[in-house]
Amino acid sequence: MPDQPHGHELVIRPLTGPDELALFRSLPYVLDHELADDLAGGLRRPEWMWVALRGDRVLARAAWWAPAPGAAPYTLDFFDLDDSLPEPERGETGVRLLETAMARLFPAGSERPEYGRFIPPDWHTDPVARDVVEARMRAVERTGARLLVERLRLEWTPGAAVAPVPGGRLAFRAVRDREELVSLMTRVAEGSLDAHTRISLASGLSPRAVSDAQYDEELAGYRSPGDWWRIAELPDGDPVGFVIPARNNYHAIIAYIGVLPGHRGHGYIDEILAEGTRILAGQDVPRIRASTDVGNVPMARAFERAGYVNFGRAVNMVWE
């Protein structure tokens, strides 16, 4: 049961309905503008949106998101604290909120969705930003989670200094079917620097199982045409890699890009990324978003060469 009110004690509860959205917005975050549409579209539910209150003052909030109406909560993407609170009150309030909400939403022993937060690109060196980020990470850690990865958020705009012009060594064609793409994804998973892929493999899943899950749970859900997806080949038809340009619920994105192990180290990533960027740019989109792990230096450099700007970062934390 949510904590019950008594005087000025802390009250922890879910929203009663969409009419309490203004209350939830009492604390700020960069995704606040998406909340109303997400609720209307079934990607959020009031019972997934929780607040910690003292009187009418919101001291902490948390919310989960689903990729499609009717789906289970997929990620904890809102977790905010009132940063005017002193420690340890600030952190303890956040911990109580998370523990209360997760006990209600996720039965004991069930998997808890990953926590993800968008953060400023300079948060390591900006004292104020660092305090905000670390306070939330500490609270999440106290509920049993750990940091999985920090990621770069990247953006290409039509005014970018680098135009998406493929180099000519590769030929591109549409993906024939699910089996062809998943087979290539399976090969790319081997030796991958991507933290999410590596943790899935470390859990005991095979590269094929990881790729099947990524296709079914992510790629198959995009609303954009599958004929945007491209296989990169050498003149003799040997596949080199692939790129998945797509639209998610909010932006045009480079959803997935990979080079097969035997072809890495030859600069093919630049041509493959240019092709994916070209396809999306041809849709007259205002921006193209992408992300990659901070530790995946080769991929980060490829995006930089292609004119993508690092406008932010993100942290992902997991419960195990």
Q: Which residue ranges define each predicted feature?
A:
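Short amphipathic alpha-helix that is part of the acyltransferase structural core
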Residues: M1-D37, V165-A209
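Acyl-donor-binding surface of acyltransferase catalytic domains
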Residues: M1-P2, R90-R176, M317
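Active-site rim helix/loop that mediates acceptor-substrate recognition in acyltransferases
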Residues: R25-G55, R198-L234
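Conserved donor-binding loop and adjoining core beta-sheet/short helix segment
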Residues: D37-D122, P235, V243-A252, L260
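A structural microfeature
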Residues: A60, V149-E150, G241, G312
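Conserved acetyl-CoA-binding loop-helix of GNAT-fold acetyltransferases
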Residues: E87-F106, V259, G265-G282, V297-R305
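Conserved active-site tyrosine of GNAT-family acetyltransferases
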Residues: R136, V140, F303, Y308
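Hydrophobic adenine-recognition pocket in adenosine-nucleotide-binding enzymes
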Residues: I257-V259, T292
